[in-house]
């Protein structure tokens, strides 16, 4: 398997034909998977905004005031309003905003980016990343994973995750197959789109040296059952329920 950065992409603007820009730079082949950063998908889809686009509600002002008190830094209620508008639910309002996005992804600040947004203040995630992936996959003829960088519970550091995908299942189901000793596997479901996203993030890098698209070549899903169930169902998610019941005590570590 190879993971190859796509070099030479220009700064992306609203209305740019992302598929054409990628096709000009990559000779796609059977077995390729394109991993593309949500940032350039969002830019092409016009998801860059100024803070003034989000007049703050009373709730946003209260959130910003509380976060300012906790952190000792002035927080902008317009940013809090943007997070509220992009969230189906806020699982925590302090010491940070942990959002359930409208497409089911759970992440800090609804995944809103405040870096690498020339001419604007905020870059929102694609409105429907899987629909975005489907359009790119249809145009390019290869599976597509739309990636984002996200933190991890219980561990420091960030990694690439999938927020949308098309042309391949999200997960590979090993249940019912056997290990090397002949024992049947009962619980193993491999989140392949997340693993592809993490691979792409490792190759793409971050900051000024980063590239927003990576082609994973000669990787195969194999002869396994697949599933598109990536986001845990609410009724099965004990961590989500625990967060709803948790109250921040005012002491930031």
UniProtKB/Swiss-Prot annotation:
The keyword Nucleotide-binding applies. InterPro entries: F420-0_g-glutamyl_ligase (IPR008225), F420-0_gamma-glut_ligase-dom (IPR002847), F420_ligase_CofE_arc (IPR023659). GTP binds at residues 9-12, 38-39, 43, 116, 204-211. Pathway: Cofactor biosynthesis; coenzyme F420 biosynthesis. It is an enzyme of class 6 (ligase). The keyword Metal-binding applies. A divalent metal cation 1 binds at residues 113, 148. Binds 2 divalent metal cations per subunit. The ions could be magnesium and/or manganese. Its cofactor is Mg(2+); Mn(2+); K(+). Keywords: GTP-binding, Ligase, Magnesium, Manganese, Metal-binding, Nucleotide-binding, Potassium. A divalent metal cation 2 binds at residues 149, 206. Its EC number is 6.3.2.31, 6.3.2.34. GO terms for biological process: F420-0 metabolic process. It catalyses: oxidized coenzyme F420-0 + GTP + L-glutamate = oxidized coenzyme F420-1 + GDP + phosphate + H(+); oxidized coenzyme F420-1 + GTP + L-glutamate = oxidized coenzyme F420-2 + GDP + phosphate + H(+). GO terms for molecular function: coenzyme F420-0:L-glutamate ligase activity; coenzyme F420-1:gamma-L-glutamate ligase activity; GTP binding; metal ion binding. Pfam families: F420_ligase. Catalyzes the GTP-dependent successive addition of two or more gamma-linked L-glutamates to the L-lactyl phosphodiester of 7,8-didemethyl-8-hydroxy-5-deazariboflavin (F420-0) to form coenzyme F420-0-glutamyl-glutamate (F420-2) or polyglutamated F420 derivatives. Homodimer. Belongs to the CofE family. This is Coenzyme F420:L-glutamate ligase.
